[in-house]
Amino acid sequence: KRAVPKSKPVCYVENEVPAAGVLAHHLEQGTLGEAPIWTDLRTFAAEPWRGVVDCVIGGYPCQPFSIAGKRLGKSDPRHLWPFIERIVETTEPAYCFFENVPLHLRDGFDEVAGSLHGMGFEVAAGLFAAAEVGAPHERERLFILAAHTERARSTGLGKGDTSSIFGGWEWRGAEDVQSILDAPFERGNRWPQPLLRGMDDGLAHRYERLQIVGNGVVPQQAAYALHVLSTALEL
């Protein structure tokens, strides 16, 4: 919505149960456009969506390429690009917008870019950090925008202005730190959680929530990436 105000989702696909729960919560709260949720990208039936979808958006698993994983690349069973490729080829969108970790440039990006070129897309990609839009942390990510050489001309991206991309951050300074130090701390209280990732490591039952926070992308960051890459493609 920040980047393309008139856009609306027609379906979601999310395999991880905790992440799907967060997605369902936002649908209930009305912070995301209402649409059905599918659970398995590998078996997702794309045929009914042919000609219905203008843009395929995805953050396919980063574990095959992330420095935090074993970096097995295409041999990792979580490598889902071939299934996304099938969906793109079947639905015939005008645009594709993807996100992944920076190391994807070294391993796997050539396959993705070559596949998109083979399907008739022009591709622009770049590294963008959340700090570029004012966030108090780096969170660098690779964003990929693909525009079909024929379909993109007739559809149009419908970009909004950049006013909603920058700003909107709640900064905390010395007064906030001092208020934490001055606050009484009694037995049984939890220590304040960190600003940068929103929560502490905690116990094992809190792992899934921390994982979701770590995998997240700052909305302004994605909107800024879309704006820059679409300008590079002269959209």
Feature roles, as predicted:
Residues 1-42:
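SAM cofactor-binding core of SAM-dependent methyltransferases
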Residues 21, 39, 79-86, 220, ...:
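Short, contiguous clusters of charged residues that form electrostatic/catalytic patches at enzyme active sites
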Residues 24, 66, 223:
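A short local structural element in Rossmann-fold oxidoreductases
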Residues 44-55, 60-215, 219:
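Class I S-adenosyl-L-methionine
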Residues 226-234:
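Short, hydrophobic alpha-helical segments
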